[in-house]
């Protein structure tokens, strides 16, 4: 019998590599399984590059399995060489703990805790931190061959550029994690990104050598690559964070709504819990009425709601609608700052509109500035102004601090007073 979960994962293209597919499928059909996915606290927030493996873990929870979320308070102090060409900078204990705390809070939004198959959050510092050097070398290191490690892509790719003994031992630490969780929480499956295959299989091999035959499986999700070949997960402003103080819900929503037609269906499969029927209907919409961008809107709505909440989604949609209509008065000062933080800014001293347009570099000359005004091309805070003698007044200064000028349909400028 085919597992409904695995059938869904395969349709979505979420299984990149897996160990013993038939045995794993039989296990998932037979019982509720504890499944784990981990991350190292390299920052105090996850970013969207972390989403795919954790959302895949969430799909296991939706099908009755128990997710175990590991935050690497110990491994985060060492540094994973996977996917790296250089050595990581070691973090202080205080910085790692700060990052662990930040990511732990985000997990509460991503998973259901306290239910019958509620998620369990663990920190590998709780067990790795208790292993002394001699125990590590005798009880674990004895079971790991150096040649075995040298054949791992994460290590082999670093041999020419150099790798420290610290990072060389990383895969052993993650292998210990899998064995510990298997023994203490009956974890039988580990999920990770495609770069984690070597670490996952190392855990299975260590368990086999230490305990004999153990029921343990591994699965990786694909590396997310955009249709233009560029790396997924970054906007022009850098990483897209799950922390709303680093990336606002509006910016987060905008990242997803700007997904090109060539990627949107794949992303709907990867990053939403919509059914096959809904996604098929949206695919038809992309083919027949792409100008409506229904698929992009649904993608942005679903991911924003999942990562943040309904109220954050509502605010993001309201800002988007207000900007589209040019109704800036519908937005608060904070919303305007967020919306226009990337537009050109200019500090001006004059209050005369014509002089302001020149001083701020909005219009190239007095003649052009006057033409722009009389032709209705200039708006102040969303209101069209066609008086060439217009003077900026106190009510034009939002919180007595800034004014938003628009020239034409899409060119915005922030004037600082």
UniProtKB/Swiss-Prot annotation:
Catalyzes the attachment of tyrosine to tRNA(Tyr) in a two-step reaction: tyrosine is first activated by ATP to form Tyr-AMP and then transferred to the acceptor end of tRNA(Tyr). Homodimer. Keywords: Aminoacyl-tRNA synthetase, ATP-binding, Cytoplasm, Ligase, Nucleotide-binding, Protein biosynthesis, RNA-binding. A motif ('KMSKS' region) lies at residues 231-235. SMART domains: S4 (SM00363). InterPro entries: aa-tRNA-synth_I_CS (IPR001412), aa-tRNA-synth_Ic (IPR002305), Rossmann-like_a/b/a_fold (IPR014729), S4_RNA-bd (IPR002942), S4_RNA-bd_sf (IPR036986), SYY-like_C (IPR054608), Tyr-tRNA-ligase (IPR002307), Tyr-tRNA-ligase_bac-type (IPR024088). Its EC number is 6.1.1.1. This is Tyrosine--tRNA ligase.
């Amino acid at each position: 019998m085919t597992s409904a979960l695995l059938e869904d994962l395969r349709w979505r293209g979420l299984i990149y590599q897996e160990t013993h597919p038939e045995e794993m499928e039989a296990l998932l059909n037979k019982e509720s399984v504890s499944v784990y996915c981990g991350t190292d606290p390299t920052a105090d927030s996850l970013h969207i590059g972390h989403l795919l493996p954790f959302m895949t873990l969430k799909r296991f929870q939706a099908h009755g399995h128990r997710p175990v979320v590991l935050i690497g308070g110990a491994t985060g102090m060492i540094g994973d060489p996977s996917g790296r060409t250089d050595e990581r900078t070691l973090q202080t204990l205080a910085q790692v703990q700060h990052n662990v705390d930040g990511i732990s809070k985000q997990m509460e939004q991503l998973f259901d805790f306290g239910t019958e198959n509620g998620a369990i959050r663990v920190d590998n510092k709780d067990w790795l931190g208790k292993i002394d050097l001699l125990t590590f070398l005798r009880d674990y290191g004895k079971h790991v061959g150096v040649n075995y490690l040298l054949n791992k892509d994460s290590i082999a790719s670093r041999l020419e550029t150099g790798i420290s003994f610290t990072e060389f031992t990383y895969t052993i630490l993650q292998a210990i994690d899998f064995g510990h969780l298997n023994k203490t929480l009956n974890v039988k499956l580990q999920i990770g990104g495609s770069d984690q295959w070597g670490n996952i299989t190392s855990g299975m091999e260590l368990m086999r050598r230490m305990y004999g035959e153990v029921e343990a499986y591994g699965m990786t999700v694909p590396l997310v690559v955009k249709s233009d070949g560029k790396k997924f997960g970054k906007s022009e402003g850098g990483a897209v964070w799950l922390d709303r103080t680093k990336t606002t819900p509006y910016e987060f929503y905008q990242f997803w709504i700007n997904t090109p037609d060539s990627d949107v269906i794949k992303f709907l499969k990867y990053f939403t819990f919509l059914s096959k029927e809904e996604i098929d209907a949206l695919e038809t919409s992309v083919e027949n009425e792409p100008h409506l961008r229904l698929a992009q809107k649904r993608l942005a709505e679903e991911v924003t709601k999942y990562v943040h909440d309904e109220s954050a989604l509502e605010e993001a949609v309201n800002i988007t609608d207000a900007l589209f209509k040019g109704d800036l008065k519908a937005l608060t000062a904070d919303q305007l700052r967020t919306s226009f933080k990337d537009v050109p800014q200019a500090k001006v001293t004059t209050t005369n509109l014509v002089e302001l347009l020149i001083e701020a570099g909005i219009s190239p000359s007095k003649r052009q500035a006057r033409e722009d005004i009389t032709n209705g091309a200039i708006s102040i805070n969303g209101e069209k102004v066609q008086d060439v003698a217009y003077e900026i007044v106190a009510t034009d200064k939002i919180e007595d601090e800034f004014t938003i000028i628009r020239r034409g349909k899409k060119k915005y400028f922030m004037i600082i007073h």
